[in-house]
Amino acid sequence: NNNNDYSNNNNNNTTNKKNNNNRNEASVASSNKKGDELAKKQVGKPVRKMTMPEYAAIMLYTSNAIYKDLNQALRDNNRLKVQKYFKYLRLFFESMSALPKQKMKLWRGMSVDLHQNPQYKVGNTVVWWGVSSCTSDVNVAKNFAKGCGGKCSIITIESETASDISDITFYSNEKESLLRPGTQLKVKSNKMNGNVCEITLQEVGTLIS
């Protein structure tokens, strides 16, 4: 019976990997197709001409195919895992550099209570090592917080270098902007409002240029 269970587990793992690969391949194909359309129109008012692969790199990030694993590798500073994404990251950084850097107020909803987190003590500077998705619509962040099922955090970000990708995404209703990996943010306030932790951060620099 144990051998049968082991065999079944292996079969299930193989099936899951195939399904994931199929989903990822479909996401890449969709991103390339959309990237081609965006490149023809030069959407997002880039500071230089953007190529189809550059648009596709941003589209792929918003497709949910890789962002969790990519950000986990970046946050863990796992060189082996990051190396897997090196070619993609190089293209992604090139695409981000082509988009105008904007000074704007953004919000981010997180399904974790950061009020007692020592990193988010007022006066501290935190570094976000992942690619950070934010929104220019506070209601998007609030709706995310409502759906987290417990204590959560709504972060207000006074950004200096955000890239507006609201027209370069599969989810245009989220009014999404991105902060680059290595963004440094100073904690200006941290308070509780009912079950919601409300934090204000001010962008003060970046560790990756």
PLM regions and their residue ranges:
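Conserved NAD+-utilizing ADP-ribose enzyme module
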Residues: 1, 15, 21-26, 33, ...
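Short low-polarity hydrophobic stretches
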Residues: 1-2, 107, 137, 187
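Long, compositionally biased low-complexity repeat segments characteristic
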Residues: 2-9
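Serine/threonine-rich, low-complexity intrinsically disordered segments
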Residues: 16-17, 64
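Internal glycine-rich, Lys/Arg-flanked active-site/core loops of soluble domains
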Residues: 24-168
